[in-house]
Amino acid sequence: ALVDTSVRLRRLSDRASAALVKIVQEGGSLRTKNFASGSFEGHERGSGETMNQVTKERGGEGVVAHGCMSGCIMRCSGLYPDKNGKLIGKWPEYETIWSFGPHSGIDDLDVIARYDRICDDVGVDTIDVGVGMGLLMAAGALPYGDADAALKLMHEISEGTPLGRVLGCGAETVGRVYGMRRVPTVKGQSLPAYDPRAVKGVGVTYATTPMGADHTAGYAVTANILSVGGKVDPLKSDGQIALSRTLQIATASVDAAGLCLFGAFAVLDIPDALVAVVDMLNAKYGLTLTTDDVVTLGQSILSTERDFNRRAGITDAADRLPDFFSDEDLPPHNTRFDISLEELKTVFNW
């Protein structure tokens, strides 16, 4: 089923999640220079197609279609070599390419791969640090697109310099230290690579998921951009609440089962796939689950997470995007996030 899904046709095994660079660029939601635009002129130099081609041409320790484990049939990763064929690190994921690439005005895949490796070695998140880097550029701490200055700053994280410590703490801290208004975080977590003004379903997820802004918590890109599991116009508000709600419930269950999220593409695309997943879990654990139980489980998990947040002082008032997403147009579609706070409050109505 995984091999036959529509997402498979986009060649995840050949381009990994970086296959999304061109797709999201075409949709006008590839966030550029701290959300100034949804389009990046140098996007092709950081695309999955380019990453695949460069890896093959350089050879050496580079690998295309590398699985996270021996039994993986998706093999949506790879190993990225330098110009001499020596390993830099794993293939950067789409989110990493975006945060250190378009978001920071950098179009050099080699240096993005080095940023990725530094984050892995230090133990910091590439989205949060990449968004923080873009904020530092917006604040004038270093120029947009200055790959060398950015690389030097990345090394300062492990060196423990004052600015390195600020960046290592992520975007929320960068915004506070520099007194910035346009800080793209929800509940302290950085917004990932899809601009909520042009992919409004994922904007609902960003605003409401208990964990803070996270695309994977309810990946509305499926129906908004990829046309997987149906189609909901990404530029309109209609249908986005229901889409995000359904996907957040499903994702909570998928996570609880320990399954790879890419397996959800098959569940969304193939009517019998969910039944197959439930049968698999029943056979493995001696259970008698039904497909209805999957929904109930997801709802229960989300309710528990929201209750935890409330006890920790994170109330429903935190279920919102930063104001600039509602106040500023996003080129090239010139759209805003226009789903009201009252509508967002209905996401968890069950």
Please give the residue ranges for each predicted region:
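Extended C-terminal regions of large enzymes
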Residues: 1-350
